Design a protein with these regions (language model features):
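Carboxylate-rich, polar loop motifs that coordinate divalent cations or form catalytic acidic clusters
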Residues: 1-340
Length: 340
């Protein structure tokens, strides 16, 4: 169980529409529709494009994605107008004009070792942070039949891309080969074969943890262990909706699901949902079994600021939540149902 405190423009947030959130130790970064926000020592600071600074200010005011380079402490921000790196107070911006970035609309960013991976509206890019060399990946050198890459999850052995309308792409770091995963029934309007493969082609997010791949789509979610697929739908799970913006795994069995009708947590056995009630807008929390049955309402006094959830990140036992109207901080209480 969490006690929720919420942030909007009324108490310092750059904009109420929050696309993403990134925890950086004691600091919290948030990408909004009107600037990059930094919450530190109880205060907000905002970063926006400065026409006079050119390549040394934020690329665009709409910040879609964030990633932390744990080796350097740098923060990378994907925006609607390029890629920006925030390093010790200095901002450097990369666009199609001054770098090897494949497109200026950067939906996803991820750092693994010396490499920064980006998901853009026209394919994927990889930057060797140490040498400055760029590599481009698109329909010409990968099985990417749609080039709208929406999210990326890099790890030491694999890099996974969510391709909007094109399923999932897997890059093997050792062999440098690509592989694609798609909806086996090819049916965009319904699920014909539930656990035979990826639930749907329109993928929005993925999370690769403990050799398990979790995938979010607009029509449900999938879990893949390298051999078997298991898919989640509202009708046979505790998800409040099939429309997902993000999925973020904790380990092989536990994950958080960001949907348009609330924030859901699955621990491998039970589900917990946090949201303002869809009808009364009052704080609501409930738990169900693995199939979404045996629903039990839990009395709560607080909830995330909006039911439309776009993403989460973790700060110890706490959780930070990006929503369509504000940023929420879930402070875990001792009798918590959902444990990190």
């Amino acid at each position: 169980m969490f006690r929720w405190e919420n942030f909007t423009t009324a108490n310092g947030l750059p904009d109420n529409h929050v696309f993403c959130v990134l925890v950086d130790g004691d600091r919290v970064w948030t990408g909004t529709d009107n600037g990059l926000g930094l919450f530190e020592n109880g205060k907000w600071r905002s970063f926006r494009p400065n026409p006079d600074a050119k390549e040394h200010s934020l690329a665009h005011q709409a910040v879609l994605s964030l990633a932390l380079d744990k080796n350097t402490g740098d923060v990378w921000a994907g925006t609607m107008g390029g890629l920006s790196r925030i390093s010790a107070g200095r901002i450097d911006t990369y666009t199609q004009l001054n770098s090897g970035l494949s497109n200026d609309i950067v939906y996803g960013v991820g750092v693994q070792g010396d490499y920064l991976w980006t998901a853009t509206a026209a394919g994927a890019s990889r930057l060797n942070i140490r040498t400055g060399q760029w590599s481009l990946y698109n329909a010409f050198n990968t099985p990417m039949y749609e080039i709208w890459t929406y999210a990326v999850s890099p790890s030491e052995d694999k890099v996974y891309y969510a391709v909007w309308g094109g399923g999932v792409l897997e890059y093997d770091q050792k062999t440098e080969r690509w592989k694609d995963y798609n909806d086996p029934d090819g049916e965009t309007e319904m699920v014909v074969m539930k656990d035979q493969g990826l639930i749907h082609e329109i993928t929005t997010s993925l999370s690769y943890v403990d050799k398990i791949l979790w995938v979010a789509t607009y029509f449900g979610a999938s879990r893949y262990d390298g051999r078997y697929w298991h898919n989640f739908l509202k009708k046979d799970s505790g998800m409040p909706s099939n429309f997902l913006s993000q999925i973020k795994a904790i380990d092989a069995n536990r994950a958080w699901f960001s949907t348009d009708k609330g924030l859901a947590y699955f621990d491998g056995t039970n589900w917990a949902v946090y949201r303002p009630a869809l009808d009364t807008h009052q704080p609501e929390m409930y738990i169900t079994d693995v199939a979404g049955n045996s629903k039990k309402e839990i009395p709560v006094k607080t909830a995330p600021s909006h039911n439309y959830i776009l993403g989460v990140d973790f700060q110890g036992d706490d959780i930070w939540v990006a929503t369509a109207h504000g940023l929420s901080h879930g402070i875990r209480e001792n009798n918590s149902v959902a444990k990190r």
